[in-house]
């Protein structure tokens, strides 16, 4: 910063030019930086590992917790152990608590597992599992995945993996139902959905002309029965013990998980004529999707 001051009484008029030259020379000199001692001290502090007290006060999304440092460091490969390793800066709230910007509703369950291996109650398992994924607590994830309802979900998913377009079909159900309800300005929409386990159609009219088992049919025979039922969405076929009613339960449950109310009932079979006396006997279900 350049400071200008009035000439003193002792300066002579003849010195005005020399004074101006001197001022210009001073103006051209580069400013000398002044060391910021506080900034230098702050940088040195960040370079050194942060030290923590034995008892740690926490603020997790506005919910307060207190635990031992050793509890947070119990498993090395976790987010909490890394946070409190001293290698990272952790912000504090106005009262000095270490702040974690995460909903603290289930953080107590996380601490209970870190303290003594305690698992949450069944109705909290899914939510705690999500938190365990966020904090990367592998041992807790393994324990929860062997607990209901996550164990049942793994078995259910093994069945759904047999239907490669299950998720896409579920999205199609939602989109069609939404579009129809909006077009009709209606509270609900109805869809026709075909759910069949066996690919081979049957007929009540005569003795089957072809082999009834799919793996015994020739390729030419199979092509005679290829067709698309006149429905909105079709699921099947699959090879598993789980039957049509199991898949219907999965569809309704997954829609409910998204907050969508769905009722279904069988309204008959496709009954489309294929060849000779053969008609498609795949069951057709009417789904009623209620939006409000």
UniProtKB/Swiss-Prot annotation:
CDD domains tied to this protein: BTB_POZ_KCTD7 (cd18366)
This protein's record includes keyword Cell membrane: yes
BP GO annotations: membrane hyperpolarization; protein homooligomerization
Record keywords, A-Z: Cell membrane, Cytoplasm, Membrane
Domain BTB residues, every copy: 56-144
InterPro entries with a match to the protein in the record: BTB/POZ_dom (IPR000210), SKP1/BTB/POZ_sf (IPR011333), T1-type_BTB (IPR003131)
Superkingdom classification of source: Eukaryota
Cellular component annotations (GO), alphabetically ordered: cytosol; plasma membrane
Principal cellular location given in the protein's record: membrane
Signal sequence, renumbered to the chain: none
Record's protein name: BTB/POZ domain-containing protein KCTD7
Species this chain originates from: Danio rerio (Zebrafish)
């Amino acid at each position: 910063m350049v400071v200008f001051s009035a000439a003193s009484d002792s300066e002579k008029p003849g010195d005005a030019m020399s004074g101006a030259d001197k001022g210009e020379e001073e103006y051209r000199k580069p400013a000398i930086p002044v060391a910021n001692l506080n900034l230098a001290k702050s940088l040195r502090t960040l370079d050194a590992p942060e030290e923590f007290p034995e008892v740690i006060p926490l603020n997790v999304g506005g919910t307060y917790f207190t635990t031992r440092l050793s509890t947070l460091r119990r498993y090395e490969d976790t987010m909490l152990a890394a946070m409190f390793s001293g290698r990272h800066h952790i912000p504090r709230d106005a009262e000095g608590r270490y702040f974690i910007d995460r909903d603290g509703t289930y953080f107590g369950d996380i601490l209970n597992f870190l303290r003594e291996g305690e698992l949450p109650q069944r109705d909290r398992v899914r939510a705690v599992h999500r938190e365990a994924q966020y904090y990367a607590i592998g041992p807790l994830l393994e324990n929860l995945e062997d607990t209901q309802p996550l164990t049942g979900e793994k078995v259910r998913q093994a069945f759904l993996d047999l239907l490669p377009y299950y998720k896409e079909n579920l999205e199609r159900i939602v989109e069609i139902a939404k579009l129809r309800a909006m077009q009709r300005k209606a509270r609900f929409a109805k869809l026709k959905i075909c759910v069949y386990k066996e690919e081979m159609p049957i007929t009540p009219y005569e003795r089957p002309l072809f082999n009834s088992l799919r793996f015994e049919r020739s390729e030419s025979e199979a092509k005679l029965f290829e067709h698309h039922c006149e429905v909105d969405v079709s699921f099947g076929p699959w090879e598993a013990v789980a039957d049509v009613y199991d898949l219907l339960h999965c569809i309704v449950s997954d829609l409910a998980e998204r907050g969508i109310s769905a009722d279904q009932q069988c309204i008959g079979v496709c009954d489309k004529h294929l060849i000779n006396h053969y008609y498609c006997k795949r069951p057709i279900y009417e789904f009623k999707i209620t939006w409000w």
